[in-house]
């Protein structure tokens, strides 16, 4: 391969990486605006994160709080079933965003696949906000249900 070909390949890679970063920054700006517009109140925002091999429910945050401040939770369904379980379609709501009613119990729950303890969120109600919400993960594969890594929102 000639030096010119190598230089072109390098510049194309840098250019494409820059485009991806610009797209991510633009998505984050839109997301920040929508979060800032949320009404304060006695509710939570939840993003379902389904993994075939894990038992976590997803990320939960307070209104007007960034997704980077959210917590990955285990859902207590003794009062209300999780939306996908209520529909008898486990995982069908992967990456769906919800307005959640409920509270953190103060307890942690062991999740065996990750060998971690996660906060317990007691669900008392929910409402779908969006089935196709803005991306909160840098990696576009973060919502793949077969993925063995749990990504953290940014």
Question: Model features per residue range: what roles?
Answer:
Residues 1-7:
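Bacterial N-terminal signal peptides that target proteins for export
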């Amino acid at each position: 391969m000639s030096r010119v070909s190598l230089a072109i390949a390098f510049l194309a890679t840098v250019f494409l990486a820059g485009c991806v970063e610009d797209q991510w920054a633009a998505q984050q700006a839109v997301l920040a605006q929508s979060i800032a517009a949320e009404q304060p109140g006695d509710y939570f925002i939840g993003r379902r994160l389904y993994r075939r091999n894990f038992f976590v429910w997803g990320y939960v945050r307070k209104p007007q709080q960034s997704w980077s401040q959210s917590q990955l939770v285990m859902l207590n369904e003794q009062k209300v079933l999780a939306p996908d379980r209520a529909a008898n379609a486990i995982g069908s709501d992967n990456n769906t965003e919800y307005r959640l009613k409920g509270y953190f119990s103060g307890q942690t729950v062991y999740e065996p696949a990750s060998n971690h303890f996660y906060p317990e969120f007691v669900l008392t109600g929910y409402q779908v906000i969006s089935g196709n919400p803005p991306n909160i993960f840098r990696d576009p594969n973060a919502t793949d249900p077969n993925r063995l890594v749990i990504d953290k929102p940014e």
